[in-house]
């Protein structure tokens, strides 16, 4: 999996059968380096990242996201939703969304368009997800069907909270 963080990337390669971690690395961008340029630099220098993988995931780690109920979600209205929450989209960003099965939740977020194109050249079947989508799914897997469960995900400068009750998400926020 590849995790795009604000100042670089984290990479984890694991065996799909044993789940054993084979490779892990973090790459921090230099001050004048774009994420796309950083991606090209790291894949040029590291042959492990150019292998064929059974599955590949790009995890977007961004504070700019929001949740919307599936009952009112329309994919054609992504730009309007974004305008309501953040006023503007960056010139090199594309709005994406994850529908979280059986929850009634859609996570809307943006990705760096140039970076996504570069990564897709190496991994044409890569699956892109926002970290909040993964955390909600992870929390639901851990939650029992009855009672309330609180999951807190800590980061260097922030945290995410996912609260579930009776197997359903109640709150998911940063």
Where are these regions (language model features)?
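Short glycine-rich, Thr/Ser-proximal phosphate-binding strand/loop in the N-terminal lobe
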Residues: 6-34, 166-174
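Internal amphipathic helical hairpin motif
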Residues: 36-45, 60-103
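Small-residue (GG/TT-enriched) beta-loop-alpha framework at ligand/catalytic clefts
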Residues: 3, 8-9, 98-174
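Surface-exposed loop/turn elements that mediate protein-protein interactions on large endomembrane-trafficking
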Residues: 18-22, 73-76, 124-127
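N-terminal phosphate-binding loop and adjacent alpha-helix
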Residues: 23-51
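Short glycine-rich phosphate-binding loop at a beta-alpha junction
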Residues: 50-64
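Short, conserved beta-strand segments within well-ordered enzyme catalytic domains
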Residues: 1-3, 10-12, 57-59
């Amino acid at each position: 999996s590849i995790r795009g963080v604000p100042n670089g990337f984290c990479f984890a390669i694991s065996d799909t059968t044993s789940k054993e971690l084979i490779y892990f690395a973090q790459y921090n961008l230099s001050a004048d380096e774009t994420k796309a340029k950083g991606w090209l630099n790291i894949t040029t220098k590291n042959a492990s990242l150019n292998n064929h993988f059974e599955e590949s995931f790009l995890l977007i780690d961004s504070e700019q996201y929001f949740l919307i109920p599936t009952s009112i979600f329309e994919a054609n209205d992504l730009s309007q939703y974004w305008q309501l929450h953040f006023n503007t989209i960056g010139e090199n960003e594309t709005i994406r969304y994850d529908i979280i099965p059986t929850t009634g939740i859609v996570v809307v977020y943006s990705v760096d368009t140039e970076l996504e194109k570069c990564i897709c050249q190496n991994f044409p079947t890569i699956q892109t997800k926002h970290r909040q989508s993964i955390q909600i799914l992870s929390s639901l897997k851990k939650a029992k069907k009855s009672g309330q469960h609180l999951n807190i995900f800590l980061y260097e400068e922030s945290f995410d909270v996912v609260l579930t009750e009776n197997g359903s998400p109640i709150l998911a926020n940063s």
